[in-house]
A protein has these predicted regions:
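The feature marks helicase ATPase cores and/or their adjacent C-terminal helical subdomains
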Residues: 1-500
């Protein structure tokens, strides 16, 4: 089952010990390598209550590792005592949720709110700082910071003289009040997990004993707080750590990735290794990408089927006026080479979500425009938009939660809240009423202002005690403009598109 491993991969899978970084170039088979090392450890594991922790940054990434383990190494679902999942889920399960009360001062287990855990709609009025609880947190130096769309706050973070805006002071006060009640977003969970391990080293020691092997895939996406958590585990006894990643492929927009931290570990840990055999790209692509990478030497094309592919990579500079032409030229060139343009064969990838409007030719929302007067109006609109575009489960879940929050006047709708309502109404009756509500809302193929008017008419006819509200200057925006950054293929194209 290990016969296809290269010499470098075999070294990683069988011989590496202690703490080391695998710096992997694109196409080097790093996920296969992670799966192979996990399989090698797994098949020889004899401890009943200590396990291997394998972490990545998205559900898609860890599920790909699990699939590799099943398809290539005869392992099904990774069982207890091992853990395979996201770094956030590991932090939540083993540090923050069981021990968060020790640093928050709340009674009992904390409640995670905001994306991806559920919709936050706290705050009783438009300027209530509690409204923004889910889009702010703390950095490694304990300073409050925005983690969401800065336009949503409705104020500058700093004054012209550089001092902290008074609104931020009020926001921090409201933030700490809600933390004391046990609410936390995912960034808070990571921050306070770090604080827990700092204040209670015995917890860090227990986790290091529980998981004596740690493998982190896509480690270039690690934030300074997440790396500090790893360091604290190492300081308290964790000795087998494998960090795998490519600093040139870091995703900066969603978790404060600091790829330089991986580079530091690569330099500090003498056992580190470079995995630079590219199994995906031609020699010309490897040569080209070297010129824009931080690797010490070009990756080596080892796939005989594509190694000598003659197509010469191109560099074309773009601006707001020529992006559409560049995409059109690219699609035309694919067709000239006999490529059937589809989501399976063709992709338009961009580094930052900030240019998605230009890529999809959808006008951008003006800077500092705050469309929403409250969070629940936005969530009803978002849920309906996703539902109308075929993401039925996502849309249903959003509207189910925000409807209960609105009707029951909750800041957060938990699974327990949903279960309580189902126990009173019955499962089929409850779900049927949610579906009926969703399907009675107007279609989302109109500007948001027109949708609000039609939706409020429906709510009034049904004698609902709430209505949707937006600011007038945002009424002309369309749903695709408002919800482009959903991470889904909302706008239909023949090719796949998204961030790298």
């Amino acid at each position: 089952m290990y016969s296809t491993l290269s010499d470098s991969q075999r070294e990683i899978v069988f011989n590496k010990l202690g703490k080391f970084v695998v710096r992997a170039c694109p196409g080097s088979g790093k996920t296969y390598c992670v799966g192979a090392r996990l399989a090698r450890l797994f098949h020889g594991w004899d401890k009943k209550h200590e396990g291997i922790a394998v972490l990545s940054f998205t559900n898609v990434a860890w599920q790909e590792i699990e699939k590799k383990c099943g398809d290539k190494f005869n392992i099904g679902k990774i069982p207890y005592p091992h853990f395979l999942g996201t770094i956030d889920s590991f932090v939540n399960k083993f540090i923050f949720l069981p021990f968060g009360h020790l640093v928050l001062g709340c009674n009992g287990r904390p409640t995670l709110v905001g994306e991806p855990h559920g919709i936050w709609s706290g705050g009783k009025y438009d300027r209530d700082p509690k409204k923004h609880f889910d889009i702010c947190s703390f950095d490694i130096e304990d300073k409050i910071i925005p983690i969401g769309n800065v336009q949503a706050f409705g104020f500058h973070w700093r004054n012209n003289d550089g001092s902290i805006n008074g609104n931020v002071v009020n926001l921090e006060k409201a933030k700490k009040e809600l933390l004391g009640k046990g609410y936390a977003n995912q960034s808070d969970a990571n921050y306070f997990a770090m604080k827990i391990l700092e204040k209670y080293p015995q917890i860090a020691k227990a986790i290091a004993i529980r998981f004596p092997y740690l493998i982190v895939d896509e480690a270039q996406d690690t934030s300074d707080i997440q790396m500090k958590i790893i360091d604290l585990l190492i300081e308290n006894g964790l000795s087998e750590v494998m960090l795998v990643g490519d600093p040139d492929q870091a995703i900066f927009e969603w978790n404060d990735a600091k790829p330089e931290l991986l580079n530091q570990k690569f330099s500090e840990w003498e056992n580190s290794i470079v995995l630079n055999e590219n199994r995906r790209s031609s020699r010309k692509i490897c040569s080209f990408t070297f010129s824009i990478s931080s690797l010490g030497s070009a990756s080596i094309s080892v796939n005989e089927q594509v190694c000598e592919f003659a197509h010469q990579p191109k560099v074309v500079t773009y601006n707001n006026n020529n992006i559409q032409q560049i995409i059109s030229d690219f699609i035309e060139e694919c067709q000239q080479y006999g490529i059937n343009v589809s989501k399976e064969s063709t992709a338009v990838i961009f580094r930052s979500k900030s240019i998605i409007n230009e890529v999809l030719n959808i006008p951008e929302i003006a800077f500092r425009t705050n469309v929403w007067k409250d969070n629940y109006t936005r969530e009803f609109a978002r849920g309906k938009f996703l539902y109308d575009n075929g993401y039925f489960k996502d849309g249903f879940k959003i509207i189910e939660r925000v409807l209960l929050k609105t009707l029951l006047d909750l800041s957060y709708c938990s699974e327990n809240n949903i279960s309580d309502v189902i126990s009173r109404m019955g499962f089929i009756n409850f779900k049927s009423q949610i579906y009926a509500f969703i399907n009675s809302l107007p279609q989302s193929n109109v500007p948001i202002g027109a949708w609000i008017i039609a939706a409020n008419k429906f709510l009034k006819e049904k004698n609902c005690k709430f209505e949707f509200q937006i600011h007038n200057d945002g009424s002309h925006y369309t749903f695709p403009q408002l919800f482009l950054n959903e991470g889904k293929q909302i706008v239909e194209k023949d090719y796949r598109y998204g961030t790298a």
